[in-house]
Every structure is written in C-alpha cells, then in structure tokens.
Amino acid sequence: MVHINVLKKFMCVLVVILIALTVCLWKETRGSYYVPLKNDGTQVHRALDKWNLLKSQGLLHEAAGEMGQMPKALPNNQNKVKGITSGAVEKSRKAAEHVKVWDKDSSSRNLIPRLQKVRKNYLSMNKYNVTYNGKMNAAKLSPEQLLCRLRDRVNVTMIRGSDGPFNSSEWQHYLPDKSLNETVGRLGRCAVVSSAGSLKSSHLGPEIDSHDAVLRFNGAPVKGFQEDVGQKTTIRLVNSQLVTVEEQQFLKDALYNTGILIVWDPAPYHAEIHEWYRKPDYKFFEAYKSYRIRHPEQPFYILNPKMQWQLWDILQENSLEHIQPNPPSSGMLGIVIMMTLCDEVDVYEFLPSKRQTDICHYYQKFHDHACTMGAYHPLLFEKNLVKHLNQGTDEDIYTHGKVTLPGFRNVHC
C-alpha cells in the first residue's frame, strides 16, 4: 500500500513537470513568432517570407551591413523626397536595411539538386565543342574594367551581304541594306524587358514606355499586359527555334510585325560563319526568307554568331567555376546589344524583384526554377555579372527588378 502511494505521488510530480515544460515551450514559440511582427518593418518581414527561404540557400544577401547601416548604394539623402514626412522617411530607411537582392557571388552550390545534375550533364555533353583555355577569375575585375572588356571584346554585328556564304546574289535580296546602327540612330535611354513571371502586377508599363527604345524577347506579348510591361516595342530579339517551330506561327502572328526583328542561332564555339551556315542549330534560313518576302519593309537582321561566344568567354573568365558550355541566354545577348546602341540601359526583371516567382513568363502559367537559375544557359553566371555591373541601387532591384547599365559609348577605358 505504501509503495502504491509513493508511486502515485511520483506520477503527480512528473505530470506537473511536463505541464510546466509545455507552458514554457509554448511561450517561447509564441514569442519568437510574434516579436518580428511588432516592429515598424511589419510589411517588409511579411513580403520577404519566401525570400528568407532562398537566403538560407545562399542565393540572396542583405544589402545593409551587419551593424544596420544604410548600404552605400542607397545614401540617406535619397529618402528626402518632397511630400514625405520624417516618419515615412524613417520607415523607408528601415525597409531599405532589409532589402534582399541577387548575390553577385552566387555559385552552382546554390542550385537545387535537379539543376545541379542538369548543369553537370551539359558540362559533360559539350555540344558546341567548347575548348576554353583562358583564365578563370584570376583577379576579380572592377565594374569599370569589366565594362571595358565587354566593349572591346564583344563585337555586336549583324550578318551582312559581304559575309562568306551570304555574299551571293540570292541573299542580296533578303538582308537589310542599312546596318542596325543606321536604322535605329543614336538612342538615349533604353529598356530591356525580360519575359519573367515577376513582371505580373508590377505596374511598370508607363515607366518602360518612357524610354527612347524598348527591346523585348521572342513571343512576349504586350496586348493585355500594357499596365505591367508597356506597349512600345522597338526591337524584338527572337531565337532560331521560335522561327522554325510551326506552332509558334512566326510567319502569321502579327505580334512580330512591329519594330525591328533580330534572330540569333547557336553556333559551334568560335566557328567561322561559313561553318555555322552549313550546319545551323536550327534550319531557320528558309523561314527568314519567307518572312522577308511577306514583310519586305520591316528590318529583320541575323545576329553574327561570333558575338555569343565572345560574350561567353567573358562570362567564363569572370566565374570561379566552369559554366555551362552553351551560348548565353537571349536575355544576356539583348542586354549587350542595347548597351551597344544606347547611352543608358534599364533592364527589368532580369534580376528578380520582391515579386520573384517560379512562373517562367508573365503571359503563361508554366512553373520551373530553371527559368530563374538557368539550366541550358549559364543564366546564374550571367546574373552575377549583371549585378556586378549595376549602377543603380539595390532598392531599385528589390522594388522594380530594375538594373541600370551604361551604354558602351559612355565607357571610358
């Protein structure tokens, strides 16, 4: 009987201890959840929930320093905007300290396992016979030095009637008479508009249309999306796959009838034009001719394939690891084309904003993480380079997905 009473007392004490521990744990959990939501940055914390998940993978970094200073790219006087109260300025300052943007030192370790495997497969496949023997980030270049490399080594030209197999009488009827520079003239501020899903609900349309010229990609529409992407199209860069695939309706869709067209096709690594001409990645030449017959007044250029590998070499030599041995993305090609034509280039949603999403295109519902991080193209390394060159602020990237780059004519080496 005595043993039973002792056992009962022991059980009661044990239950009390368990209850006390449960209460303590509940308070601790409750506190850790609610405390961040009590400060002035409530909206910032909520908006950044999914970005914090990416941060744990090392893809994103805090723009502000560990001590909470304003980042150098965002001086305090930028908050002194007419009509904003001092309280609003303080909230804006605190929000800026939590801005999280693309980390220019991102690496393949940041890729999800599936994309890491895809990258390794492309490295071993080496479809374009890449034999790069140059340096790999031996000494990290300053943005100014890198701009000089791009200006001096990437030759942005279009196929001309004097180029190898295109100098026949047959081709003279199809290639434009004027060069691209002659056609567009001197351009001031230009916009490069990606097709990213994060453009949805951005309300960037009026800002995009305020530029002197706008470049868009492939089949990205403006009709129905003007509020977010604008309606002006000066140049449309399309890949050769789109031109040759029947379901894209390239020859029939009125979408392509506006502005200047440029088509590009992947070529073997540093191949001569005649070698690429004999065996293009996609047999788009007949479709090109058909389009020119239907629309003889619309300028339609073929990008010289040498450019893609000149640009790829610079991407590789400024990366610490081997990048995919495939041509740069249309996005990266378009950025460099506009840097050649314009005094200043604003690039929208090439680096993801606070609206970052795995939806690939603003006009479709297809989801894939590769659209942000890259699979076939060395997109991750392209974004590292663009972030390094950015002359705008991290706040511009976070809020608008906007990167500002100088035109090459304003680069002084």
From Swiss-Prot:
GO CC annotation, single: Golgi membrane
EC number of the protein: 2.4.3.1
Membrane topology (UniProt): Single-pass type II membrane protein
Annotated keywords: Disulfide bond, Glycoprotein, Glycosyltransferase, Golgi apparatus, Membrane, Secreted, Signal-anchor, Transferase, Transmembrane, Transmembrane helix
Gene Ontology MF, one: beta-galactoside alpha-2,6-sialyltransferase activity
One GO term (biological process): sialylation
Source species, domain of life: Eukaryota
Subcellular location: Golgi apparatus, Golgi stack membrane; Secreted
Record topological domains on the Lumenal side: 27-413
Tissue-wise expression: Highly expressed in testis, brain and liver and to a lesser extent in lung and heart.
Self-association and partners: Monomer and homodimer.
Descriptive protein name: Beta-galactoside alpha-2,6-sialyltransferase 1
Organism: Gallus gallus
